[in-house]
């Protein structure tokens, strides 16, 4: 009995001591963050949030529509609380923006902290000396704010994909293209063509699809909107037919295709997002593509995610696939750990001694 009591007392002491232990300024028992993907908590005075320019400016940024979707869907689901209510319960939210407006500051500034009170978590603080400069700064940096939290959410998806992804498709992509990519495990069905692979969940609704294809890099106009759409349509017409003869995938109205030059692994990439449709059928949905240059092999490698989800919200489905596009690893590259976020911002290391 004495030995049992001794071991019990040791266990009790460990339970009392360990939660207070620190490693790199953080508790060993960091709680899991609360909230769903693409939910945002804004910490700002209620009157300022609802009635004044500073609040209206921030709401206007966060309440914008996601580009490239057939129906309007907001970038984030937003909640607001006052600073006095930002307690232990609210601090573990996954995405937080804190408005810090004080005359001690000389100019507006963005800074962020990761995993301060929970994990995974991103807290952005927007500092400004007054409300007018806050509003002006937020409006000017609206896309920076959106990209920061969008890519942070995608990084969480990449972490999940690293732990669990479709190994069969990764192996197929390796043998066909000499590349690696992580896609969700439920894309089990696949089709192989010439320099082409298509993986799909093959569901009637909320159908997720991934495509990879390549072609020689020979044209100076390769990374233009017109060239990309022409190449995409020619590849999809051959490889993604419809239910009946004469049906095939094509890009919907090119006027609604948005393109951008982006950075992936510190290398140039061409991004396109828009809508696809099935010629001769009533099917369609959104797509997003990345085209990258594989210089040693003189080719362009394109990865694309597209969704067929009639009467369903598509934001989270598309962003899940978009995160997978960032995991494309060309020959002689190493697999990505995360998308770069917060470039040009100050990252503050968390020291949460009072969780």
Predicted features by range, described:
Residues 1-8:
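Bacterial N-terminal signal peptides that target proteins for export
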Residues 17-20:
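C-terminal motif of bacterial Sec signal peptides marking the signal peptidase cleavage site
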Residues 25-28, 34, 41-47, 184-248:
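Secretory pathway targeting signatures of secreted, lumenal, and periplasmic proteins
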Residues 26-44, 49, 104-166:
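Solvent-exposed alpha-helical segments and adjacent loops
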Residues 30-35, 43, 47-50, 60, ...:
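N-terminal "mature-domain start" segment
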Residues 74, 78-133, 237-298, 312, ...:
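Signature of long, low-cysteine stretches enriched in small and polar/charged residues
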Residues 135-156, 187, 300-355:
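Surface-exposed amphipathic alpha-helical segments
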């Amino acid at each position: 009995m004495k030995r049992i009591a001794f071991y019990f007392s040791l266990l009790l002491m460990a339970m009392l001591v360990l939660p207070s232990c620190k490693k790199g300024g953080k508790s060993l028992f960091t709680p899991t963050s609360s909230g769903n993907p693409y939910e945002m908590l804004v910490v700002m005075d209620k009157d300022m949030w609802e009635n004044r320019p500073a609040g209206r400016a921030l709401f206007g940024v966060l309440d914008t529509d996601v580009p490239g979707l057939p129906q309007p869907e907001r970038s984030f689901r937003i909640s607001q609380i006052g600073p006095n209510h930002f307690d232990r319960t609210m601090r573990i939210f996954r995405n937080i923006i804190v408005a810090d407006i004080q005359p001690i500051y000389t100019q507006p500034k963005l800074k962020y902290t990761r995993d301060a009170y929970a994990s995974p978590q991103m807290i952005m603080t927007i500092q400004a000396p007054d409300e007018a400069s806050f509003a002006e700064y937020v409006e000017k940096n609206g896309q920076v704010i959106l990209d920061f939290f969008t890519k942070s959410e995608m990084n969480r998806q990449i972490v999940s994909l690293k732990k669990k992804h479709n190994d069969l498709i990764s192996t197929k992509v390796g043998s066909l293209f000499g590349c690696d990519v992580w896609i969700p495990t439920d894309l089990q069905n696949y089709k192989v063509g010439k320099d082409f692979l298509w993986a799909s969940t093959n569901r009637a609704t909320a159908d997720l699809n991934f495509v990879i294809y390549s072609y020689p890099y020979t044209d100076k106009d390769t990374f233009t909107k017109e060239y990309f759409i022409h190449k995409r349509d020619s590849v999809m017409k051959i490889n993604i037919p419809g239910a009946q003869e004469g049906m095939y995938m094509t890009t919907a109205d090119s006027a609604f295709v948005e393109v951008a030059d982006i950075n992936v692994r510190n290398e140039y990439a061409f991004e396109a997002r828009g809508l696809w449709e099935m010629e001769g059928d009533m099917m369609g949905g959104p797509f997003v593509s990345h085209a990258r240059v594989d210089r040693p092999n003189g080719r362009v490698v394109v990865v694309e995610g597209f969704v067929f989800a009639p009467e369903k919200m598509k934001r989270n489905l598309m962003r899940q696939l978009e995160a997978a596009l960032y995991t494309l690893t060309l020959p002689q590259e190493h697999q990505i750990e995360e998308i770069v976020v917060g470039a040009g911002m100050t990252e503050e290391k968390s020291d949460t001694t009072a969780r």
